[in-house]
């Protein structure tokens, strides 16, 4: 890598001061400002990337990067000073669409870019490539960072470009966990879904498929299987647990959703592990072989068995060995001054429950991006206080007999109380030993009912469990929970 002195000696340099923030705990306190570093942009900046300096660099082009860019623009700090380095071929987009509307059949109005660029998912402006250009934000497409030197503040991309940063935000997200190649994990017709290219490949396969197997009973598996129903395909979901969505759903709740999927023709094979995927004479996947020896025919396989944080060359920044990801404090500062991490890759303190965590969800991606940039650009030192939130919307294609939309807030710990018949509503409440409401789940709620959920989960009020158990409807149960907010027993 060329030296810093080479850039400093170039003619016509433009210098600026970069604020570097100190480290420490996540409490609301004064944050020391470190001595200013002065950087100089090479005179050849317009012609190439030989030691081209940037005041701010975001590595990663996913949801969090798009929302971070918006916050930079809101502060008037993006014009000519911000660069996004991405492995994606497109500007940041709302990734949840890839397992929902993007997979709809062509005759059922599938989602396509530029329709779901950030920040439309939160009601904001659609940030197309033109938006980034108009706001002076440089985006390097399909050119991920492959090398990092924290001492010299230097990044190297896969194409050989060299960037020097003042402040760095790591927003590399996650990658899909894969089946080993030796058991057929890379066969033609085996799909993983994480970006638009993955989704395009899957859509192409769905258009020719007859029998599909979905491996995994979590978010990806359930959303892809629901989309496959729109194509009228023979669909089987295989997973090792006793029921779908085991990290969130209770057995009772899972049973109701499983029955709905079965009504749409989906078959379940529970408590099963994949031994291998076999190829046919054409080399394409033809079946899934289970550990018990049974064989499930399939011409298309979708694997949804989780995701792993993309640390890449940034391991030296500091990895949390318990939850994975790059460890940060409540302002998203890493162990190295001037380096931050946001979104799926960030291991951060979950203030509400006093534990370190990592959240793979678009809501956290959006909020962590905003919080981090606010902390970077202002004197804001309020610790990030995230309320866990998950949701899913499936069977929303035209012609579907029943649309599904549920939301969950809080922590799914403690005793559960389920109310409702799933026609269409159902609610589940998680109550701890002190009768405090810790988490709440609602299917098919109204906008007013959904807006109540975060209030309940955040306040953690003491509820009357006997009344809640005797509620005759979801509406009645929510009103009982709402009344507990005013009892003076909230956290």
From Swiss-Prot:
GO molecular function annotations of the record: monodehydroascorbate reductase (NADH) activity; oxidoreductase activity, acting on NAD(P)H
EC number assigned by the record: 1.6.5.4
Organism placement in taxonomy: Eukaryota, Viridiplantae, Streptophyta, Embryophyta, Tracheophyta
Gene: MDAR5
Catalytic activity as recorded in UniProt: 2 monodehydro-L-ascorbate radical + NADH + H(+) = 2 L-ascorbate + NAD(+)
Family: Belongs to the FAD-dependent oxidoreductase family.
Gene3D superfamilies assigned to the protein according to its UniProt record, in alphabetical order: 3.30.390.30, FAD/NAD(P)-binding domain (3.50.50.60)
Source superkingdom: Eukaryota
Gene Ontology cellular-component annotations: chloroplast; cytoplasm; mitochondrion; stromule
Keyword presence, Repressor: no
Source species of the chain: Oryza sativa subsp. japonica (Rice)
The UniProt record lists the keyword Transit peptide: yes
Cellular localization per UniProt: Plastid, Chloroplast
Keywords of the record: Chloroplast, FAD, Flavoprotein, NAD, NADP, Oxidoreductase, Plastid, Redox-active center, Transit peptide
Transit peptide: 1-42
List of residues binding FAD: 61-64, 88, 95, 100, 194-195, 344, 362, 391
One Pfam family cited in the UniProt record for this chain: Pyr_redox_2
Annotated protein name in UniProt: Monodehydroascorbate reductase 5, chlorplastic
């Amino acid at each position: 890598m060329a030296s810093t002195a080479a850039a400093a000696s170039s003619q016509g340099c433009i210098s600026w001061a970069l604020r570097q923030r100190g480290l420490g705990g996540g409490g609301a306190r004064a944050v020391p400002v470190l001595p200013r570093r002065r950087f100089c942009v090479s005179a050849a900046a317009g012609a190439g990337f030989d030691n081209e300096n940037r005041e701010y660099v975001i590595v990663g082009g996913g949801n969090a990067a798009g929302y971070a860019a918006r916050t930079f623009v809101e502060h008037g700090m993006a014009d000519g000073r911000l660069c996004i380095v991405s492995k994606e071929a497109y500007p940041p987009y709302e990734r949840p669409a890839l397992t929902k509307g993007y997979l709809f059949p062509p005759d059922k109005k599938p989602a396509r870019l530029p329709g779901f660029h950030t920040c439309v998912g939160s009601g904001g402006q659609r940030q197309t490539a033109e938006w980034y250009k108009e706001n002076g934000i440089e985006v390097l497409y399909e050119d991920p960072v492959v090398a990092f030197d924290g001492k010299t503040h230097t990044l190297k991309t896969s194409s050989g470009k060299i960037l020097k940063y003042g402040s760095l935000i790591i927003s590399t997200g996650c990658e899909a966990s894969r089946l080993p190649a030796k058991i057929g994990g890379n066969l033609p017709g085996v799909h993983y879904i994480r970006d638009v290219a993955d989704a395009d490949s899957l859509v192409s396969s769905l258009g020719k498929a007859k029998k599909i197997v979905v491996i995994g009973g979590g978010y990806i598996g359930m959303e892809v299987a629901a989309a496959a129903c729109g194509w009228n395909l023979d669909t089987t979901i295989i997973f090792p647990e006793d029921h779908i969505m085991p990290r969130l759903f209770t057995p009772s709740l899972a049973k109701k959703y499983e029955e709905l999927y079965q009504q749409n023709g989906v078959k379940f094979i529970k408590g099963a592990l994949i031994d291998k995927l076999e190829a046919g004479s054409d080399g394409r996947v033809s079946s899934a072989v289970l550990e018990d020896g049974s064989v499930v025919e399939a011409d298309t396989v979708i694997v949804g068995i989780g995701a792993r944080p993309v640390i890449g060359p940034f391991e030296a920044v500091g990895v949390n060995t318990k939850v994975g990801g790059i460890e940060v404090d409540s302002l998203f500062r890493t162990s190295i001054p001037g380096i931050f991490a946001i979104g799926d890759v960030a291991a951060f303190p979950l203030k509400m429950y006093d534990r370190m965590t990592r959240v793979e969800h678009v809501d956290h991606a959006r909020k962590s991006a905003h919080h981090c940039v606010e902390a970077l650009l202002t004197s804001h030192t309020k610790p990030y206080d995230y309320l866990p939130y998950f949701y899913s919307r499936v069977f929303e294609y035209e012609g579907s007999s029943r649309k599904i939309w549920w939301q969950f807030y809080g922590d799914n710990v403690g005793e559960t109380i389920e109310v409702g018949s799933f026609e269409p509503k159902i609610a589940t409440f998680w109550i701890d030993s002190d009768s405090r409401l810790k988490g709440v789940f609602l299917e098919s709620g109204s906008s007013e009912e959904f807006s109540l959920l975060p209030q309940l989960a955040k306040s953690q009020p003491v509820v009357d469990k006997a009344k809640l158990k005797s509620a005759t409807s979801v509406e009645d149960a929510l009103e009982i929970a709402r009344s507990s907010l005013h009892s003076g027993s909230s956290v």
